[in-house]
Amino acid sequence: QLVIDFHQHGGHLALCGGPQSGKSGALRTIVSSLALNRRPEDIRFYVIDLGGGQLAALDRLPHVAGVAGREEGEKIRRIVDEVAGFIRRPESRETFLIIDGWHHIGPSNAEFEDIAESITDIVADGASANVHVVIATSRWTTMRPAIRDLIANRLELRLGEALDSLIDRKLQQKLPSAPGRGLTQAGENMLLAHTSNQDIAHICRVHANAVPAPQLKMLPAVLTPEALAAHGEAPTGGIPWGIGGRDLSTLAWNPEREPHLVAIGAQGCGKSNFLAQVMRGISRLPREAARLVVIDQRRAHLGTLDQDMVAAYAATQSSAQEEIVNTVRTLEQRLPGPDITPEQLAARDWWAGPDIYVVVDDADLVSDIALAPLIDLLPHARDIGLHMVIARKSGGIGRALFGQFFSAVRDLQPAFLLFDADRDE
């Protein structure tokens, strides 16, 4: 009887086999065997199925948090992010990351090469966090030494080329062409058990009364302001605008830490919705602490703003230029004079009034002449309570970033959000 001990030799397993050698079937058996003898409270599985889809049936098991196929790129990356989270915050429950089709991840220019480094980190640190990785690949050469050397447990099914064997080339040549036949780490012949859909159904019946493992968290298709507010508290001092990151936690912009905010993306990607959410957050601040100056050439925010918080609104080139000049006049009065002490500069108490948030939507439609008066004030923005919140289309951004205004904003290292955009830009 062949037994794989995931509490020895680093806790991970690599399985290699050629076409039709039974790699996917082996993974089904490993998951099913572990699930049969363990409760969902004790063990859970995340499955990345880049093979022929034979692992999809595992999703029926109460132990399985999620199964992602090759066409589900976002779900695949969410699985990797969620499992990586257990490395940072270990749990008593054991977690298995099952990957079928490593040749779609490991080699250079592979379809999912971007997740290879994260998986390598999981393998490197997983043993101390009750996280195990099981990988099936078509050739050992698809696994870079950085990850292959970390996986001591190895099984070989029949390979396409016996010369590729890491266990025994001569024994590889003698293996019959039958799914499940292979070599153990010690060079002994083996036959892996076959797991049918009926077997999986039996395991489901055995654990019918068990509490299922928590399911994989995914981003919603639509996030309303109400859903965002109910999602969870934003970091202290932050203005919430979405959810994301490895933990799908509330994302927020902190104007005190990063006074300026820039969003870039293709047309229709949601930049204006993003600005609307940021302005809703600003509007929740006390009126004596914040006021909005809104440049809105497309009138996307007309009638949606809290008028008590709006100091100025401009929807044309001429009005934009006029309101920016008026704003600059107000802010110039806050510039520190020669008699300001270091203590006053740190406390910012030589002037009184709200911080001014200049919000520019579709900045590509606003002329450089209109924005030019702000340039001289940008280096003093922290001292005078000036915040720039800008959205611009990605087309032509390469040139725009070297223009006077955007160059000055870029030098201040603003918080930056990149939406869908042309890679060449």
Regions found by a protein language model. Give the residues of each.
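Charged, amphipathic alpha-helical linker segments immediately N-terminal to NTP-binding catalytic cores
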Residues: 1, 209-237
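P-loop NTPase catalytic phosphate-binding loop
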Residues: 1-159, 234-343, 347-414
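Intrinsically disordered, low-complexity acidic/polar segments
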Residues: 13, 199-201, 223, 262
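Generic structural signal of hydrophobic/aromatic residues within well-ordered alpha-helices
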Residues: 61, 115, 200-207, 219, ...
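Conserved P-loop NTPase
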Residues: 160-220, 422-425
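Feature targets compositionally biased, intrinsically disordered low-complexity regions
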Residues: 179-181, 186, 231, 236-237, ...
